[in-house]
């Protein structure tokens, strides 16, 4: 979500800025932990990883407060939409820009991410389809169960299996 959207309150904008900040810190701290391990500094890597974990908790709390954590099916719909945008628009544009600026390192990074986004879209879409099928089957089963019920002769308000 863009934080420059005019209909956001200051608090909503601040929540989004905090979410982005926590996500960036998480990524950086994990990257720094990997570098510390490469340099033979596991104790420093552990510090980076512990703080990265705390940043995750902060970010998740901000997401919750911002109302972004919904039902699993809604979350799957949200991420498939996001992955579709990344795969279809964001990364292709970034690749073109990097090519125009002769930044092969960025082209490679964006291209790899684009391929992974395709995979992410596939697995999220599959999970969404499976959940929708399960919910449809569950709904049909509930309807079928109700259709197979008849009113008890003793009381019109009590259902019994036929």
Predicted regions and their residues:
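Non-heme di-metal
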Residues: 1-162
């Amino acid at each position: 979500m863009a934080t420059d959207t005019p209909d956001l309150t200051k608090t909503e904008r601040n929540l989004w800025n905090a979410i982005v900040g926590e996500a960036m810190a998480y990524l950086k701290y994990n990257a720094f932990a990997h570098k510390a391990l490469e340099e033979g500094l596991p104790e420093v890597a552990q510090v980076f990883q512990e703080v990265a974990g705390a940043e995750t908790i902060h970010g998740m709390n901000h997401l919750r407060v911002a109302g972004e954590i919904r039902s699993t099916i809604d979350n799957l719909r949200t991420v498939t939409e996001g992955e579709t945008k990344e795969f279809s628009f964001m990364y292709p544009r970034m690749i073109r820009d990097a090519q125009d600026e002769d930044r092969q390192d960025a082209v490679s990074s964006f291209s790899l991410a684009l391929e992974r986004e395709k995979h992410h879209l596939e697995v999220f879409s599959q999970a969404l389809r499976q959940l929708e099928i399960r919910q449809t089957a569950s709904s049909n089963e509930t309807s079928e169960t109700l259709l197979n019920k008849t009113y008890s002769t003793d009381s019109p308000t009590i259902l019994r299996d036929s």
